[in-house]
Amino acid sequence: MRAGPRRQHLLPPQDNRAAVGYQRQDPVIPPQRDLDDRETLVSEHEHKEKTCQSAALFNVVNSIIGSGIIDFSLILLIKGGALSGTDTYQSLVNKTFGFPGYILLSVLQFLYPFIAMISYNIIAGDTLSKVFQRIPGVDPENVFIGRHFIIGLSTVTFTLPLSLYRNIAKLGKVSLISTGLTTLILGIVMARAISLGPHIPKTEDAWVFAKPNAIQAVGVMSFAFICHHNSFLVYSSLEEPTVAKWSRLIHMSIVISVFICIFFATCGYLTFTGFTQGDLFENYCRNDDLVTFGRFCYGVTVILTYPMECFVTREVIANVFFGGNLSSVFHIVVTVMVITVATLVSLLIDCLGIVLELNGVLCATPLIFIIPSACYLKLSEEPRTHSDKIMSYVMLPIGAAVMVFGFVMAITNPQDCTHGQEMFYCFPDNFSLTNTSESHIQQTTQLSILNISIFQ
């Protein structure tokens, strides 16, 4: 392979490659730039460490659950890469819409995983602090079990070392562990829906479907279900990647993820209805030992998901500012800088709901609905009546509407947050509550039944 000239600062990828020495047989998507995802994340001496299909499956499932359920959109993305002869999301958009599209996509592709890293830190700090508070003899006000210390400690001991890997294939086993812990969490949430749900007062109109804030919910779901930003990374880590193999992998990943996400959301809402918080574990009582174990599993899960997002942010920075080629020193420097900034921001923000909404409508929605559809519509020579084009014509305006209206509603009608507060139904003593909401709902509930015995 020939060595291409080094790109200048902020220039998009061109049709050349660095002499890295990495090759694979029969590529479905030809090489397009100096140092692409395969070369950055799977170096020459690591060529034999390509992931098998099962490891890639767990990487995709982990990305979806932690952080796309949009099956068609994911396959459309890889098809667009095949049509354009590109092998990264950025190079696909650059080939389709030129430099302006490349810059816009780079900003979105950086912001989404970066904000996701912030949200994962918030979850880890909130969740694990409650776990350590349950240790006998530990003062709840102890600074060493506070969310700030836990965020810093988990960053230094776990997320930073894992994020320093150059090969995304090495995260396959980590993603398997994360997926297994997610299954345990699902079991705990289901158990508490049965044992705790009947004792939680239901809010009025709890079962009214598609209220006006449904648009905000779509934004949150977009945040949760996206893995488009790292799809090419996982695709490139496959042995002998093909569109057919990718389609099978995505179908299987989506089935697993849909099952877990639907059951998790349904059981959580069945338990708490209108009291449900952005972080579901904020709803459970601190003296619930079973949920405490679930919190521990949940905290570990988001910590293990964190590196997947860091890989993408680092790759975007490498492409835009360093021509795609990060030396060992700059690899460490960029990783440390990104994680440091994300950690500092997460220390200042403690409400998860608004983070999920804004990241969903502003970043995830374009990455899922708008950009893949627009690229495919411009590149494909299929007739307009082709099924792929029809779906693309449907997805594009839906994504634009969700983005605009979701942002307006997230700003004008932000989600309430009760971070760090014990919910009213957690008090073990007899308790009479009259709750008046904005819609003048009044509920009076005797909560004497909610004593410690419920949580044993």
UniProtKB/Swiss-Prot annotation:
Glycan-modified residues: N94, N325
Membrane topology classification: Multi-pass membrane protein
UniProt GO BP: sodium ion transport
Listed InterPro entries: AA_transpt_TM
Highest taxon listed in the record's lineage: Eukaryota
Localization per record: Membrane
Keywords: Amino-acid transport, Glycoprotein, Ion transport, Membrane, Sodium, Sodium transport, Transmembrane, Transmembrane helix, Transport
Transmembrane segments: 58-78, 98-118, 143-163, 171-191, 206-226, 252-272, 291-313, 329-349, 351-371, 390-410
Region (Disordered): 1-25
GO cellular component: membrane
Keyword Glycoprotein (UniProt): yes
Molecular function, one GO term: L-amino acid transmembrane transporter activity
Family stated for the protein in its record: Belongs to the amino acid/polyamine transporter 2 family.
Chain's role: Putative sodium-dependent amino acid/proton antiporter.
Protein name as annotated: Putative sodium-coupled neutral amino acid transporter 11
Biological source species: Macaca fascicularis
Lineage: Eukaryota, Metazoa, Chordata, Craniata, Vertebrata
Gene of this entry: SLC38A11
